[in-house]
From Swiss-Prot:
Entry function: Antitoxin component of a type II toxin-antitoxin (TA) system. Neutralizes the toxic effect of zeta toxin. Part of a postsegregational killing (PSK) system involved in the killing of plasmid-free cells. Continuous synthesis of the epsilon antitoxin is required to counteract the zeta toxin.
GO molecular function: toxic substance binding
Protein name per its UniProtKB record: Antitoxin epsilon 2
Species name: Enterococcus faecalis
Self-association state and partner proteins as the record states: In the presence of the zeta toxin, forms an inactive PezA(2)PezT(2) heterotetramer.
Domain of life: Bacteria
Family: Belongs to the epsilon antitoxin family.
Keyword field: Plasmid, Toxin-antitoxin system
């Protein structure tokens, strides 16, 4: 599978966005001293899901799949901001 400039650029954007989203949720979990083994907590489940999603080998994906993965991380970015903000207000 050939690696093009566009594909490499897309992968770099996904890597930056996924790290940002994952770190936001991880910081929330750590700052609130949540039990990372307690799968009843939404934030812990989200953290686990994001960790698994980060393990995908992006260089093995076709460009079209990278676009879908990018959209997934955009959605998780919005979602994590929403739920973590609501938790702070409550």
């Amino acid at each position: 599978m050939a690696v093009t400039y566009e594909k490499t650029f897309e992968i770099e954007i996904i890597n930056e966005l996924s790290a940002s989203v994952y770190n936001r949720v991880l910081n929330y979990v750590l700052n609130h001293e949540l039990d990372t083994k307690n799968t009843r907590l939404l934030e812990v489940n989200l953290l686990n899901q994001l960790e698994v999603a980060q393990e995908v080998d992006l260089f093995q994906q076709p460009f079209e799949e990278l676009q879908a993965i990018h959209e997934y991380w955009r959605s998780m970015n919005q979602y994590s901001k929403q739920i973590l903000t609501k938790e702070k207000v409550a």
